[in-house]
């Protein structure tokens, strides 16, 4: 009975692994088993350790071995995966897009692009590719205090846009166009749509909350223009004057009432220094830029609906037509939780992270350094589409997409972490010939071998005197002693391993190259085959470990972990 259950578990686990091209999920396997065999539900506690045992074995296999084993055990489950229809994915048509669109991605450059930024970059640029037109990268960088720009981040955004396949047709920095906002502000004053408010902040808030106008609201155009010029010439200090956009002072939402469009900031700006002392707030700057740049469609978070409502007052005053707007919900990534660029910046400055490309961070730079491809991010974000529902996703989904892309092109290499030396009695070949790829003929690699090799400590833990195993692409051995670890050669034949159903483990030469793998959760050190040093800046698969990108080669190889 136990053997029958074990076989069912193995089939369902392999199906889960093949479907998602990642290590099988314990909960999914348990759910499938209980769904197919409800009679086993009372035994769930007893079965759980059995599932864990089977999953541990499957995790040691390659994706190619998963599929081969599943075809052998249950080909109908392969067909079930193939036949299952995928839900509709991709970008839905844009209304009013015929004839071309102008779309923008408008970050504050206070840090490099994150995965959230990548979504905006990719989706906006993809719509431009669909309909023709212009994709604009606009830096909304007019807050030198609360969201102070990083001078390096401007170039980082441009680099990452290009890497993501979204090279902008035009690049604009709002901080270099402040005179244009001054022109609009003055026209707005002339039209009676704005006034200079001299109220203290607390006094204005009390009036606003009571839906009462401040005493400056009814100033004449000339009075407002004179006060505006005093803001510009330095007569007022920070906090003494703001330019407000007239709205409905009785609006049911206090946030809509006479919002601030400009304020005085004397702090130097990283890009333009002290050229300006009166800066537009984001709602004003963004609204004006969308008009000046001829933006036709805006993608923005549904949490910014209030910004749109405020901006429409400005558009109405100026007689402009507001662009079409699509709202989307938040995307939360399990592995990273809630994060903000400003908090990450402080953590980096405090030494908690090595930099913006630290493998633990959700930045595009970190993804690239780990070996996550631009193609995988594009495909994933496009499939995610545009919808108002908040969604939670796992990095496993991005990893699965990346695995599909890199698996055919990644050479295979041996890396032994936590190495333990084994001495083998017999004529073990001095050099092993192993394929660079298990299913695509790209030739072979030569690996130093001989009678002294290294095995992973976790593999050794499962051995005992009398255990028989196959060292991948080398030979079959029988363990004779554990302390010290010694074995005897059986033969070299893969057929023997098949006939005896030997467990297959990888190995590394004793005189191999030191390797350090940096990952989101841990750092592993060990020894790898010398050929790893030929893979600089490439994505490879360390067999039975996972996909990595080789970051540097010297006295040791430094690799960044991508995923299994």
From Swiss-Prot:
The keyword Magnesium does not apply. A motif ('HIGH' region) lies at residues 107-117. InterPro entries: Gln/Glu-tRNA_Ligase, Glu-tRNA-synth_arc/euk, Glu/Gln-tRNA-synth, Glu/Gln-tRNA-synth_Ib_cat-dom, Glu/Gln-tRNA-synth_Ib_codon-bd, Rbsml_bL25/Gln-tRNA_synth_N, Ribosomal_bL25/Gln-tRNA_synth, Rossmann-like_a/b/a_fold. GO terms for molecular function: ATP binding; glutamate-tRNA ligase activity. NCBIfam families: gltX_arch, PRK04156.1. It is found in: Cytoplasm. It comes from the Archaea. It is an enzyme of class 6 (ligase). Its main location: cytoplasm. Belongs to the class-I aminoacyl-tRNA synthetase family. Glutamate--tRNA ligase type 2 subfamily. This is Glutamate--tRNA ligase. Catalyzes the attachment of glutamate to tRNA(Glu) in a two-step reaction: glutamate is first activated by ATP to form Glu-AMP and then transferred to the acceptor end of tRNA(Glu). It catalyses: tRNA(Glu) + L-glutamate + ATP = L-glutamyl-tRNA(Glu) + AMP + diphosphate. Pfam families: tRNA-synt_1c, tRNA-synt_1c_C, tRNA-synt_1c_C2. One of its GO terms (cellular component) is cytosol. Its EC number is 6.1.1.17. Keywords: Aminoacyl-tRNA synthetase, ATP-binding, Cytoplasm, Ligase, Nucleotide-binding, Protein biosynthesis. SUPFAM superfamilies: Nucleotidylyl transferase, Ribosomal protein L25-like. GO terms for biological process: amide biosynthetic process; glutamyl-tRNA aminoacylation.
């Amino acid at each position: 009975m136990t053997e029958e259950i074990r076989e069912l578990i193995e089939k369902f686990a392999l199906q889960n692994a093949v479907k998602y091209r990642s290590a099988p999920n314990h909960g999914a396997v348990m759910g499938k088993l209980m769904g197919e065999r409800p009679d086993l539900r009372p035994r769930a506690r007893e079965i759980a350790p059995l599932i864990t045992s089977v999953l541990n074995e499957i995790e040691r296999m390659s994706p190619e071995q998963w599929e081969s084993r599943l075809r052998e055990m249950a080909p109908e489950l392969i067909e079930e995966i193939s036949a299952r229809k995928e839900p509709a994915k991709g970008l839905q048509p844009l209304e009013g897009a015929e004839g071309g669109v102008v779309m923008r991605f408008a970050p504050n450059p206070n840090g490099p692009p994150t995965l959230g930024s990548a979504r905006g970059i990719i989706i906006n640029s993809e719509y431009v590719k669909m309909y023709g037109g212009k994709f604009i990268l606009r830096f909304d960088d007019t807050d030198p205090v609360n969201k102070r720009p990083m001078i390096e981040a401007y170039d980082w955004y441009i680099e990452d846009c290009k890497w993501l396949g979204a090279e902008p047709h035009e690049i604009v920095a709002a901080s270099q166009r402040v005179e244009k906002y001054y022109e609009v502000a003055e026209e707005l004053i002339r039209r009676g749509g704005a006034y200079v408010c001299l109220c203290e902040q607390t006094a204005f808030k009390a009036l606003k909350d009571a839906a009462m106008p401040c005493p400056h609201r009814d100033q004449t155009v000339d009075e407002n223009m004179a006060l505006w010029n005093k803001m510009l010439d330095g007569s007022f200090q920070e906090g003494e004057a703001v330019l407000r956009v007239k709205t409905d002072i009785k609006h049911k939402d206090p946030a809509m009432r006479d919002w601030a469009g400009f304020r005085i900031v004397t702090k130097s700006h990283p890009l333009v220094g002290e050229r300006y002392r009166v800066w537009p707030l984001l709602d004003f700057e963004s609204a004006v830029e969308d008009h000046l740049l001829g933006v036709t469609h805006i993608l923005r978070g549904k949490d910014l609906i209030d910004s749109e409502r405020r901006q429409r007052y400005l558009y109405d005053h100026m007689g402009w037509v507001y662009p079409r707007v699509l709202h989307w919900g938040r995307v939360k990534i399990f592995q990273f939780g809630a994060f903000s660029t400003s908090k990450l910046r402080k953590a980096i400055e405090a030494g908690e992270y090595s930099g913006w490309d630290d493998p633990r961070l959700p930045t595009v730079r970190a993804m690239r350094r780990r070996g996550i491809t631009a193609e995988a991010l594009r495909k994933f974000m496009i499939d995610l589409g545009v919808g108002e529902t908040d969604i939670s996703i796992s990095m496993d989904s991005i990893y699965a997409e990346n695995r599909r892309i890199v698996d055919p092109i990644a050479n295979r290499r041996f890396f032994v972490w936590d190495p333990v030396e084994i001495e083998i009695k017999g004529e073990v070949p001095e050099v092993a010939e192993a394929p660079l790829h298990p299913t695509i003929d790209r030739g072979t690699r030569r690996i130093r071998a001989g009678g002294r090799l290294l095995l992973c400590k976790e593999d050794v833990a499962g051995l005992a005197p009398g255990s028989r195993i196959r060292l991948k692409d080398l030979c079959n051995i029988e363990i004779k002693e554990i302390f010290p670890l010694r074995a005897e050669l059986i033969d070299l034949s893969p057929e023997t391993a098949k006939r005896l159903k030997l467990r297959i483990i990888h190995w590394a030469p004793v005189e191999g190259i030191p390797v350090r793998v940096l990952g989101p959760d841990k750092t592993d050190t060990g020894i790898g085959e010398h050929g790893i040093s030929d893979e600089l800046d490439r994505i490879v698969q360390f067999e039975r470990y996972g996909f990595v990108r080789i970051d540097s080669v010297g006295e040791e190889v430094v690799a960044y972990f991508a995923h299994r």
